Amino acid sequence: MSAADYQRPHYAPGVPAVVALPTQPLSTVLDDAAKRFPQRIAVDFLGTNITYAQLHTQVQRAAEALRRLGVRKGDVVASILPNCPQHLVLAYATWRIGAVLAEHNPLAPSSQIEEQLKLHGGKLIIGWEKSLAQLDKDINLRDYNVYAVNMTSALPRHLQAALRLPVKAARAKREEMRAPVPSWIGSWDRLVASSPALPADTALPDVNDVATLLHTGGTTGTPKAVKLTHMNLGSNTAMGLAWAGPHVKDGQEVFYSVLPYFHAFGLTLSMLCAVALAATQVVLPKFSVSLVIEAWKRQPCTF
């Protein structure tokens, strides 16, 4: 049966009824964007700008850091992060080496995260300092290999300096973004910064390999870890771009990435579709009217 037999008259003009299945793993989405638009701003994080070339370099370093930690194809890497540049880098690095990214809500109760960790069996955790500080109080994190993300390390230098000021407003903002973690927990930011790039000849995963585990809400039963392959997520990306296709242009769009990366919608729309378009992502760790207004002054959104 041909694609013409699947035409949908209720679809918008120009939207195909059938899209081609992806033949390459998810990490190649970023590879392609970095080749086509290396100097395009990939990420705006509260004023910090990261180009696609820089993002690609960070991903290659993070991939090698994971490999040197012993992560191999099929191993699970637990991400307990809000939207931030480190989250984006970790995802593409994990996919690049064929490992599986298990997404967790960083604001979820410790008991829920503990059950999810047991469910997928991953032993490496990359987490936000505030999430790890709470988890360390509630569960035995020493059963895992744990690295902390300092979200303020991705801020512009002037904002980092402002957070160190001995004033109430700076202290409140610092406490909102950071928390002290035990000394045995490593620094993910420092590890990636000191790592060389992944060897270029490192084998890519197959499109049918599992790429991500997303956890269901458990509304109708026990929460489950849903296995999503590179094919699953690549197909979702292709379909999303097919619907948006007549209205977006490669290398010209600005997405406001406020939908959580750890949810299917945010992962597909922002982490994948935006990168496939070589769009600029204004990455927002949470929704805030003031954050959006400030972002609009820097980068008015198109999507």
Language model features with spans:
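Conserved AMP-binding/adenylate-forming core of the ANL superfamily
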Residues: 20-22, 31, 39-84, 88-92, ...
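Conserved AMP-binding/adenylation subdomain of ANL enzymes
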Residues: 234-254, 262-303
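Conserved S/T- and glycine-rich ATP-binding loop of Class I adenylate-forming
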Residues: 77, 94, 125, 210, ...
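Flexible, non-catalytic linker and terminal segments flanking ANL/adenylate-forming cores
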Residues: 1-23
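Conserved adenylate-forming
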Residues: 66-72, 195-208, 213-257, 277-281
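A short helix-loop-beta submotif of the ANL/AMP-binding
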Residues: 63, 76, 82-102, 106-110, ...
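Structural core segment of the AMP-binding/adenylate-forming
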Residues: 68-69, 96-190
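Alpha-helix-centered segments that form part of catalytic cores
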Residues: 23, 175-207
